[in-house]
């Protein structure tokens, strides 16, 4: 597995959770002897929603909401078997979406 890389994509609505998860992944990978590139912050996706407040009249009365999706990218170079096992056993926060890709 010396020629393979692991690319990890993290997504979350809370930037503190995603930074904490990225820190845990980098510490775990470095502890097992792998080299880590990142975390690289990717552009934040902002979804905006406009909702009418009144059910009948007053079209000018509206509320606006926003959901921000934060993303981070990590590359683990030259992972060992211990690195893969440690990453699979790692328990991350519930609000973080993790995607692993072997390259």
UniProtKB/Swiss-Prot annotation:
Protein's UniProt keywords contain Transport: no
Biological process (GO), any one: translation
The keyword Acetylation appears for this protein: no
SMART domains registered for this protein in UniProt: Ribosomal_S10
PROSITE patterns: RIBOSOMAL_S10
One Pfam family it belongs to: Ribosomal_S10
Molecular-function annotations in GO: structural constituent of ribosome; tRNA binding
Highest rank taxon of the organism: Bacteria
Alphabetic keyword roster: Ribonucleoprotein, Ribosomal protein
Protein function: Involved in the binding of tRNA to the ribosomes.
Recorded family membership: Belongs to the universal ribosomal protein uS10 family.
Complexes and interactors: Part of the 30S ribosomal subunit.
Protein name: Small ribosomal subunit protein uS10
Gene: rpsJ
